[in-house]
Amino acid sequence: MSDEDWQVSRRLFAVLQGGVYSAMLYISSLPEMEQDKCKRSFKKRLSEKETGFIFRLRKAEGIRWSFHTRDYYIGYVREMVAGSSLPDSLRLYVYISNPLWHQSYRPGLTNFNTEWPFVNMWIKTGFMWDDIESQNICKGGEISHGWGPGMVGIVIKAFSCGERKIKITPVMIIRGEIDPTEWCGDCWNLMCLKYSPPNTLQRLAMLACGKEAKEWRGCCNQRFVSPFRTPCDLEVVQNKPKRNLLWTGEL
């Protein structure tokens, strides 16, 4: 990298800390030949910040894979469904709750949803990546001080079919108390992940008793329209996770 390129990159990074809008203003003021290069660098930095933020939240919740999106205008409940429409296929239901509903109740990571499986992702009414290191949205499983009602929304509900999930043990299977084939392959995999130790023969045996998870591909036709977008905002789960990932996943 030349000295000149390094100066541009350093300035861009400094502006990025001030927010997306400032960074885009800075890029638009550059000569046309430099704009494309800076846009690519800018998008890469946004992606890294988003990915790191999402990874930390998913790790705290034990979510191995998930759908996520951001919307600047969160004014009402929106539902998005990703997955195949075929019977017995895995579907992903995402409900974005209205932040105004949290005037008196703001759920935290430890108390917002008792039903499993679930997916959750924090959504704020600003840019998720603006000065993200100092936002300190969540601490100890609860929303941090300074985030008032209406400032944080939450994506609720599960990626799975409508079959009820229960707590399972190998003993229940051996005694014939439950029939693993009553659940689709995806549901059985999720329950095995939840209630069996990772990297054990016990988990492999439980998974082998159920149906094979069918291949599926997401086909979400809806998009959240907003002028404040990056390519990362359109990320959708496209393919079913591989079985080896499910086998070794730790919740």
Swiss-Prot record:
Question: Under which name does UniProt file this protein?
Answer: Virion infectivity factor
Q: What is the lineage of its organism?
A: Viruses, Riboviria, Pararnavirae, Artverviricota, Revtraviricetes
Q: Does the keyword Chaperone apply?
A: no
Q: Looking at the keywords, is GTP-binding present?
A: no
Originating species: Feline immunodeficiency virus (isolate TM2) (FIV)
- Which GO BP terms, alphabetically? viral life cycle
Keywords assigned by UniProt? Host cytoplasm, Virion
Q: Which InterPro entries is this protein grouped with?
A: Vir_infectivity_fact_Lentivir
Q: What is its main location?
A: host cell
**One cellular component (GO) term of this entry:** virion component
Q: Where located?
A: Host cytoplasm; Virion
Family in the record: Belongs to the feline lentivirus group Vif protein family.
